[in-house]
């Protein structure tokens, strides 16, 4: 029997890769994506740099930023690649969420929501707006994927329940996020000095939200020990390293709860007297927790866009030649506006 030609070998390899991508669940794919969203100045960049072992000061994220990391699996084995996306501006740039979420990346995509624990009044609206916008975009991609590959879309919907045991008592009461979700509460060093009752409400609320969405929940700060634990969790998302099974639900310590290990019975009811809960008109359990939380921490009615600075004037993006040309063009524009204004006034006088 004649030996295979180089062309036949290459063709067989391509077909093999194609079939494995269609049949597998994405666990063996060497490229994964992690998308960081959350509170403005909440520490997202710091976490990413720590995970990538980059010793450099974090810079403010302007809009949507990208970087990547690589990990060696062994000798003569291709490196795993992790794509890290970060959305800046808190909730002011929701339109950019759709950019990294595509049908090509969704099967190996994860979301990390970083919430600033030191600003409890901003916590719920930040969390709600970002998760709703992200879920909306993911649902659109899954729906689009279903029209081309119904099997892949079906596998994604089934995978949503992978973190929840089949016999978990809360299984019928939850609504898992479409893709892996990790919620990180940052600035625990400030949060730990809060009044105990406030800490209790925040901890219980975040535990409920994380459990409802089938997400992991953990707190972090500048502490090296906590950053190492967070790094382990992110590495699991980015490179498929073994998932941690540790758990800490003590509100007097940094929470660390892996997805699927909490329960509604352990979390308990919303922290409000029964007679007060009865007065709240809620459409769903999530709505009830929201009303209870905002009773203690009413959201501040602020314009989320007012803090977004003009990047053209940001010194970290300075380019002398470009800036000089910009000044010149701005002056020319102002001169044109003045001359145009005079021309129109002259026309009005003549008429």
UniProtKB/Swiss-Prot annotation:
In the record, biological process GO terms are:
intraciliary retrograde transport; intraciliary transport involved in cilium assembly; regulation of cilium assembly
Where do Basic and acidic residues bias regions lie? Answer: 323-337
Q: Which UniProt keywords apply?
A: Cell projection, Cilium, Cilium biogenesis/degradation, Cytoplasm, Cytoskeleton, Developmental protein, Dynein, Microtubule, Motor protein
* PANTHER family associated with the record: CYTOPLASMIC DYNEIN 2 LIGHT INTERMEDIATE CHAIN 1, DYNEIN 2 LIGHT INTERMEDIATE CHAIN, ISOFORM 2
Among InterPro entries, the record links this protein to: DYNC2LI1, Dynein_light_int_chain, P-loop_NTPase
Would the keyword Nucleotide-binding turn up in this protein's UniProt record? no
**Compartments where located:** Cytoplasm; Cell projection, Cilium; Cytoplasm, Cytoskeleton, Cilium basal body; Cytoplasm, Cytoskeleton, Cilium axoneme
Role, per record: Acts as one of several non-catalytic accessory components of the cytoplasmic dynein 2 complex (dynein-2 complex), a motor protein complex that drives the movement of cargos along microtubules within cilia and flagella in concert with the intraflagellar transport (IFT) system, facilitating the assembly of these organelles. Involved in the regulation of ciliary length.
* Protein name per UniProt: Cytoplasmic dynein 2 light intermediate chain 1
Q: What is the lineage of its organism?
A: Eukaryota, Metazoa, Chordata, Craniata, Vertebrata
One family name in Pfam for this protein: DLIC
């Amino acid at each position: 029997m004649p030996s295979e030609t180089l062309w036949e070998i290459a063709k067989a390899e391509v077909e093999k890769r194609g079939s494995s991508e269609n049949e597998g669940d994405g666990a063996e794919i060497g490229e994964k994506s992690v998308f960081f969203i959350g509170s403005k100045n909440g520490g997202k960049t710091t976490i990413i740099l720590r995970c990538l072992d980059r010793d450099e000061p974090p810079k403010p994220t302007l809009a949507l930023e990208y970087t990547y990391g690589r990990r060696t699996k062994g000798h003569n084995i291709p490196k795993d690649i992790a794509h890290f996306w970060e959305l800046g501006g808190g909730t002011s740039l929701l339109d950019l969420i759709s950019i990294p979420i595509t049908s090509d990346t969704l099967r190996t995509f994860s979301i990390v929501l970083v919430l600033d624990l030191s600003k409890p009044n901003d916590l719920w609206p930040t969390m709600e707006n970002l998760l709703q916008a992200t879920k909306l975009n993911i649902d659109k991609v899954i729906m689009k994927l279903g029209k081309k590959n119904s099997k892949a879309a079906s596998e994604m919907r089934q995978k949503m329940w992978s973190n929840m045991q089949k016999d978990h008592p809360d299984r019928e009461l939850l609504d898992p996020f479409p893709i892996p979700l990790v919620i990180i509460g940052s600035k625990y060093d400030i949060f730990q000095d809060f009044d105990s009752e406030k800490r209790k409400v925040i901890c219980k609320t975040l535990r409920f939200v994380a459990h409802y969405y089938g997400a992991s929940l953990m707190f972090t700060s500048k502490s090296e020990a906590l950053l190492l634990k967070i790094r382990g969790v992110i590495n699991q998302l980015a490179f498929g390293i073994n998932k941690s099974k540790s758990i800490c639900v003590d509100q007097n310590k940094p929470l660390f709860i892996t997805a699927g290990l909490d329960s509604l019975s352990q979390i308990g009811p919303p922290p409000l007297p029964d007679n007060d809960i009865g007065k709240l008109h809620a459409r769903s359990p999530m709505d009830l927790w929201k009303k209870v939380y905002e009773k203690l921490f009413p959201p501040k009615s602020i314009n989320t866009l007012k803090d977004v600075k003009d990047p053209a004037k940001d010194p970290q993006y300075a380019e002398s030649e470009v800036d000089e040309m910009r000044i010149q063009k701005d002056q020319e524009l102002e001169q044109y506006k003045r001359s145009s204004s005079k021309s129109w006034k002259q026309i009005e006088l003549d008429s």
